[in-house]
Amino acid sequence: AYDPDPYKRYSAEHTFFLL
C-alpha cells in the first residue's frame, strides 16, 4: 500500500486489514 496519496494508502491498509 505504497500510494503517494496518504488517504488512499490509509484506505488500502484498512481495506486489506478488514479482509
Curated annotation (Swiss-Prot):
GO molecular function per UniProt: metalloendopeptidase activity; metallopeptidase activity; toxin activity; zinc ion binding
Cofactor: binding details: Binds 3 Zn(2+) ions per subunit.
Annotated GO CC locations: extracellular region
Tissue distribution of the protein: Expressed by the venom gland.
Influence of temperature on activity: Optimum temperature is 37 degrees Celsius.
Activation and inhibition: Inhibited by EDTA, 1,10-phenanthroline, cyanide, and serum alpha2-microglobulin. Not inhibited by EGTA, PMSF, leupeptin, pepstatin and aprotinin.
Keywords of this entry: Fibrinogenolytic toxin, Fibrinolytic toxin, Hemostasis impairing toxin, Hydrolase, Metal-binding, Metalloprotease, Platelet aggregation inhibiting toxin, Protease, Secreted, Toxin, Zinc
GO biological process: proteolysis; venom-mediated disruption of extracellular matrix in another organism; venom-mediated fibrinolysis; venom-mediated hemorrhage in another organism
Cofactor needs: Zn(2+)
Enzyme class: hydrolase
Annotated compartments: Secreted
Main location: secreted
Activity vs pH: Optimum pH is 7.6.
Protein EC: 3.4.24.-
Task performed by this protein: Zinc metalloproteinase that causes hemorrhage in mice following intradermal injection and impairs hemostasis in its prey. In skin tissues, it degrades components of the basement membrane surrounding blood vessels and capillaries. In muscle tissue, it degrades the extracellular matrix, thus causing muscle necrosis. However, it lacks direct toxicity on myocytes. Hydrolyzes alpha-2 chain (COL4A2) of type IV collagen more slowly than the alpha-1 chain (COL4A1). Hydrolyzes fibronectin (FN1). It also impairs hemostasis by acting on fibrin(ogen) and platelets.
Family, as annotated: Belongs to the venom metalloproteinase (M12B) family.
Name of the protein in question: Zinc metalloproteinase partitagin
